[in-house]
Swiss-Prot record:
InterPro entries: Phage_T7-like_1.2 (IPR020147). This is Gene 1.2 protein. It comes from Enterobacteria phage T3. This is an inhibitor of the host (E.coli) dGTP triphosphohydrolase (dGTPase). It is implicated in DNA replication. Keywords: DNA replication, Early protein.
Length: 92
């Protein structure tokens, strides 16, 4: 289970990173949440998988994020989305 609250500035940065990818590169960003029992740590682990797809449905990039703090996780996701945006900009 995620802990903490997401700072609104970080949430706005995340939304901006998604919007830039969609507008500049005509891609879709999908998020899938997951959770599982982690017997090694004797706890439940959870996280999210972010995937970037072309309009035709081809996977461009994907990454799994597992952080116990929501704010840390959204910052990591935002940084990754910005990196994907930069890589796509130079790839075209």
């Amino acid at each position: 289970m995620m802990m903490g609250r997401i700072y609104s500035g970080n949430l706005n940065d995340y939304k901006d990173a998604v919007a830039r990818l969609q507008e500049d590169h005509d891609v879709t960003v999908k998020m899938e949440s997951f959770s599982y029992e982690n017997p090694a740590k004797m706890c439940r682990s959870c996280g999210e998988v972010l995937s970037v797809f072309t309009r035709s449905g081809h996977l461009v990039a994907s990454r799994t994020f597992e952080h116990s703090d929501s704010d840390v996780q959204i910052n990591a996701q935002t940084a990754w989305l910005r990196k994907v945006h930069s890589e796509l900009k130079h790839w075209k």
